[in-house]
Amino acid sequence: MEMASAFTLNVRLDNIAIITIDVPDEKMNTLKAEFASQVRAIIKQLRENKELRGVVFISAKPDNFIAGADINMIGNCKTAQEAEALARQGQQLMAEIHALPIPVIAAIHGACLGGGLELALACHGRVCTDDPKTVLGLPEVQLGLLPGSGGTQRLPRLIGVSTALEMILTGKQLRAKQALKLGLVDDVVPHSILLEAAVELAKKDRPSSRPLPVRERILAGPLGRALLFKMVGKKTEHKTQGNYPATERILEVVETGLAQGTSSGYDAEARAFGELAMTPQSQALRSIFFASTDVKKDPGSDAPPAPLNSVGILGGGLMGGGIAYVTACKAGLPVRIKDINPQGINHALKYSWDQLEGKVRRRHLKASERDKQLALISGTTDYRGFAHRDLIIEAVFENLELKQQMVAEVEQNCAAHTIFASNTSSLPIGDIAAHAARPEQVIGLHFFSPVEKMPLVEIIPHAGTSAQTIATTVKLAKKQGKTPIVVRDKAGFYVNRILAPYINEAIRMLTEGERVEHIDAALVKFGFPVGPIQLLDEVGIDTGTKIIPVLEAAYGERFSAPANVVSSILNDDRKGRKNGRGFYLYGQKGRKSKKQVDPAIYPLIGAQGQGRLSAPQVAERCVMLMLNEAVRCVDEQVIRSVRDGDIGAVFGIGFPPFLGGPFRYIDSLGAGEVVAIMQRLATQYGSRFTPCERLVEMGARGESFWKTTATDLQ
């Protein structure tokens, strides 16, 4: 049976050809290798029709132009040569579109990313809608790749090399107004007139490329170029710590094209694409992409979710304010905040105002849209307006009796169907539900701070939580823009449980004499966004260490923190950045102030600050304990799969994405090698490094957690 075409051609009476992109049976348009023959057949028809005045590419999908190339194509390549051939095929197709003798215009609405933007760049002009869904970018670097269908060559020539490098090196996505300002698109119009605006542009001569700003012209010259690439190279190396080979290759390929011409540039692009596709970093990053896509499709349980029309929040603090923001402004649901103190309500409302006003200032949002979203949030000091809320999120202090009281009050003041979701980070959900009249409607919903930035939530059913409660809570988390993983109701859940030994070990090394900045730098070099000591300061030392006694009581000595160190720090009124002093000292500008290590920290904890360990030795000690605990979590079914474990670690604590998560990292080293390292560390530093039974068994059998492909579990 012949495959339905993703590209269809219709010629209007005014002799403008409309090519409609609509990949059959898919929500998103993605480019596949087999579409090349369809596009070539259309190009042949266009060339044969001498009456044509212009061509418009437009999508039939409601909210995307082309979201990128189908990543499975890369996974199917077995060698760098095969991946290189894939890139050359894409380059050739784009060249054929660009070589058409009549104006070719891309009419863009929704996501125009990766190969989609490369197709738009191959057109002679671009018009996009002013809709918030419309974004343009080249995110390939986030998969350990570079744009392989001409993007590294066309974009710098269109918008200037420094602006193009920023887009390609970061995967940054532009909104319509930004794209227009930079010259990436020629016009921005309402969605209702997109096609007509593109047709009008197609009837004119090919749009002439607008002159680049003087700065960009200087940077494109030999002297400016040398300086630019040196500066950007240094900045990129500092940011990536050499862990992401794609960034280095992007710089090399863009510079080749500018210095030696487009022919050499395209050649370098295809070659680099092929080589990068085979790197372990790209394979790991693609595995994270597939796993997160998979998690987002997972309903959490087999039961259908209940309707979600409105949400209540108990507590207007930092977490409550953040949860209110994502519920109203991302999920679009009415939110009612209850706080015993009117100040708490004001704080929560101001939090959302600040977030939205920032978007208005950056021109990402209209003032009218800001007001519309803010109108979804209201507050009260009692339970007025809570009677018909479908789900209540509790974000009060970490106190069991208080949370049990909240359950009782919600059951008394809300509807019989109302779900109670606790944002606890350490208390067992079963204990919170112990006196509930409807325990099947009690669940944990653990957000991470700052709520609006952290993509992960843990959803924690206790033994009596119903399947529908799980499904409804998962549905809410997805509407809030979060990636949810369902975890078992055991102390620390998953993320905090694997994080605690990692932080404990960092503190232990401090007491042994390692310096704060050396420990943090070692873990940043390993690939974490910040080091463990800085992380503790950012979270708040009081908040971050509260869970350690809970974990020690549940799991024993391996979770014990170095004696008296935490209490010494807290007794000295050191809470971290929030009060200006922790392991680091902070200036007066709050979150934006620069930090420096406080030398007084060493005598306070009885340490010398004269360490002897190398950076890899420091990282090894912290990371091995995290890996061991992650394997225990699989063994005890705290997480449902290693997929969830990898996603939880990468999205919840910033485990290096280029390693693919704890389980993929164990596979890359080999379970046997991890066991050998841990046994050596156990001999040197104590029994907390003893590898767990599951890891030892897997090492002995030569087993791995994942199959060899990026998408399949063992």
Swiss-Prot record:
Gene3D superfamilies hit by this protein: 1.10.1040.50, 2-enoyl-CoA Hydratase, Chain A, domain 1 (3.90.226.10), NAD(P)-binding Rossmann-like Domain (3.40.50.720)
| Positions of region (Enoyl-CoA hydratase) | 1-190
Q: Under which pathway is this protein filed?
A: Lipid metabolism; fatty acid beta-oxidation
Localization recorded for this chain is: Cytoplasm
In the Enzyme Commission scheme, what number(s) does this protein have? 4.2.1.17, 5.1.2.3, 1.1.1.35
Sorted alphabetically, which keywords does the UniProt record give? Answer: Cytoplasm, Fatty acid metabolism, Isomerase, Lipid degradation, Lipid metabolism, Lyase, Multifunctional enzyme, NAD, Oxidoreductase
GO-annotated cellular components: cytoplasm
Marked site (Important for catalytic activity) residue numbers: E118, E140
Region of interest called 3-hydroxyacyl-CoA dehydrogenase, as start-end residue ranges on this chain = 306-714
Q: Which reaction does it catalyse?
A: a (3S)-3-hydroxyacyl-CoA = a (2E)-enoyl-CoA + H2O; a 4-saturated-(3S)-3-hydroxyacyl-CoA = a (3E)-enoyl-CoA + H2O; a (3S)-3-hydroxyacyl-CoA + NAD(+) = a 3-oxoacyl-CoA + NADH + H(+); (3S)-3-hydroxybutanoyl-CoA = (3R)-3-hydroxybutanoyl-CoA
According to the UniProt entry, its GO molecular function terms are: 3-hydroxybutyryl-CoA epimerase activity; enoyl-CoA hydratase activity; long-chain-3-hydroxyacyl-CoA dehydrogenase activity; NAD+ binding
Listed under GO biological process in this entry are: fatty acid beta-oxidation
What Pfam families has UniProt attached to this entry? 3HCDH (PF00725), 3HCDH_N (PF02737), ECH_1 (PF00378)
Mind telling me which SUPFAM superfamilies this protein's record contains? 6-phosphogluconate dehydrogenase C-terminal domain-like, ClpP/crotonase, NAD(P)-binding Rossmann-fold domains
The UniProt family comment states: In the N-terminal section; belongs to the enoyl-CoA hydratase/isomerase family. In the central section; belongs to the 3-hydroxyacyl-CoA dehydrogenase family.
* NCBIfam families membership: FadJ, PRK11154.1
Primary role: Catalyzes the formation of a hydroxyacyl-CoA by addition of water on enoyl-CoA. Also exhibits 3-hydroxyacyl-CoA epimerase and 3-hydroxyacyl-CoA dehydrogenase activities.
Cross-referenced HAMAP family: FadJ (MF_01617)
Quaternary structure and interacting proteins, as annotated: Heterotetramer of two alpha chains (FadJ) and two beta chains (FadI).
Official protein name in the record: Fatty acid oxidation complex subunit alpha
Please tell me the species this chain comes from: Shigella sonnei (strain Ss046)
Name the gene that codes for it.
fadJ
